[in-house]
Amino acid sequence: MTENYKHTSVLLDEAVNGLNIRPDGIYIDGTFGRGGHSRLILSQLGAEGRLLAIDRDPQAIAVAKTIDDPRFSFVHGPFSALADYVSERDLTGKIDGILLDLGVSSPQLDDAERGFSFMRDGPLDMRMDPTRGQSAAEWLLTAEEADIAWVIKTFGEERFGKRIARGIVERNRIEPMTRTKELAEVVTAATPVKDKFKHPATRTFQAVRIWVNSELEEIELALKSSLGVLAPGGRLSIISFHSLEDRIVKRFMREQSRGPQVPAGLPMTEDQLRKLGGRYLRVLGKMMPGEEEVAENPRARSSVLRIAERTNA
């Protein structure tokens, strides 16, 4: 990282308020980033409170080291493994709240060397953790055209996915792409109809980033783990930034709040119904950023905060 980035967390107060912080509670900030949410949580905890922060971005490690607080601990890794981190600390079923701020952060987008943005030329990387897995350039060079098209259509909701995939494969045959600018140029050239409100490469960059980082799978794993990690009354406070993320969160909260779906007229005793499982979550609602926050931070426009509470089931 070549410079110090100031990062304003979207829906900062609302997301932390959604945790309903208890002074002696135990909380998880699953997406530490630059520490905005963690610092606010710590400010509301008493001497007996604890906060475990998680992030797979190596740049978050240096930021975490600046928080000299005995109540605070940090794990470098994916939030999908939160159940393991909690189990190692003998805290399973004792967590009072989990906060997740999904997707790519502004500092990651603004750092050209990370390769997340088509607005800044840099290495075609896009990995949240550059020490693990394939970079975007490596995947695009080795993947089949049909697979690239599927990823762009599925995770970018891009209607010209096949044309763009063909352009990527043809470009890589001539000379392998290594820069974000090169990918943006290929996508732009392969897009026959341009959206005047959106750069042609927006959806493709989103799709490749999601695929390279297994972002949606990470979310699903973390959500499933949360049920066993949270104490009764523990909160889930989750910020999504695009419809694919929000769809997963919304569906999970809805399904876990409905309880077992039994066909009408099926004769079952109360004991049999209990064995099927109960309503594990109570949905508390959703929030969107206000006009003032969007004006100050345009990237907040598409964000959605959803909050749910673990039941006694």
Curated annotation (Swiss-Prot):
<feature type="binding site">
    <location>
        <position position="55"/>
    </location>
    <ligand>
        <name>S-adenosyl-L-methionine</name>
    </ligand>
</feature>
<keyword id="KW-0489">Methyltransferase</keyword>
<keyword id="KW-0808">Transferase</keyword>
<dbReference type="Pfam" id="PF01795">
    <property type="entry name" value="Methyltransf_5"/>
</dbReference>
<keyword id="KW-0963">Cytoplasm</keyword>
<feature type="binding site">
    <location>
        <begin position="35"/>
        <end position="37"/>
    </location>
    <ligand>
        <name>S-adenosyl-L-methionine</name>
    </ligand>
</feature>
<dbReference type="GO" id="GO:0071424">
    <property type="term" value="F:rRNA (cytosine-N4-)-methyltransferase activity"/>
</dbReference>
<dbReference type="InterPro" id="IPR023397">
    <property type="entry name" value="SAM-dep_MeTrfase_MraW_recog"/>
</dbReference>
<dbReference type="GO" id="GO:0070475">
    <property type="term" value="P:rRNA base methylation"/>
</dbReference>
<keyword id="KW-0949">S-adenosyl-L-methionine</keyword>
<dbReference type="InterPro" id="IPR029063">
    <property type="entry name" value="SAM-dependent_MTases_sf"/>
</dbReference>
<keyword id="KW-0698">rRNA processing</keyword>
<dbReference type="InterPro" id="IPR002903">
    <property type="entry name" value="RsmH"/>
</dbReference>
<comment type="function">
    <text>Specifically methylates the N4 position of cytidine in position 1402 (C1402) of 16S rRNA.</text>
</comment>
<feature type="binding site">
    <location>
        <position position="108"/>
    </location>
    <ligand>
        <name>S-adenosyl-L-methionine</name>
    </ligand>
</feature>
<feature type="binding site">
    <location>
        <position position="101"/>
    </location>
    <ligand>
        <name>S-adenosyl-L-methionine</name>
    </ligand>
</feature>
<feature type="binding site">
    <location>
        <position position="79"/>
    </location>
    <ligand>
        <name>S-adenosyl-L-methionine</name>
    </ligand>
</feature>
<protein>
    <recommendedName>
        <fullName>Ribosomal RNA small subunit methyltransferase H</fullName>
        <ecNumber>2.1.1.199</ecNumber>
    </recommendedName>
</protein>
<dbReference type="GO" id="GO:0005737">
    <property type="term" value="C:cytoplasm"/>
</dbReference>
<comment type="similarity">
    <text>Belongs to the methyltransferase superfamily. RsmH family.</text>
</comment>
